[in-house]
Amino acid sequence: WLDRTVLIICDPTTDDGVPIAVAPRSILRNQINRIEALNLRAMVASELEYFLYRTSYREAAQTAYRELEPAGWYIEDYHLLQGARTEDLNGAFRRYLSEMAVPVESTKGEFGRGQHELNIRWSEALEMADRHVLLKQCVKEVADQNGAAATFMAKPHDSEAGSSSHLHLSLWSTDEPNNLFPGATEILGLKVSDTFRHFLGGW
């Protein structure tokens, strides 16, 4: 979203090149290594919800972040019209993320005024974590470029629906590209494997 600009995600290290243990990517990589030792791969998809405002970040700061103007004026969950009314922003998010090789599946209105959701296609856990960071950076900066504002806060308004971040998790075999969760055991109408049962509840 900025011409002639590169955004680099990297791992912090000591002067000797040792990864910083408490860095989020180091922590996640350690967990991935533990999973891979079991011949498994963790696959993740992300759904992030956020509120959009026609108030700029500067204007919001000047009013102590009160009385912000929602990008939508009614609850738009699955409503056809409101999607077009915020396409200037959501469309830009999708385009810029796609240009950065972050595959967006969809955007949609949610159950709060100006609330939306952006879904990213699943990938391996570390790549998804990086995509998650890029998504939030993109949404905030592109909103700012358009005189708008966005927040991923869980509950910015007590009178509106809250925002969440849904993560879809599955375990795959390292030997072949198979999701190990489907199986023969029925739970609540789903046919699942023992791997899924252990993953879900430890039983």
What feature does the model see in each segment?
Residues W1-W203:
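Glycine-rich, acidic/polar active-site loops that bind/position phosphate-bearing ligands
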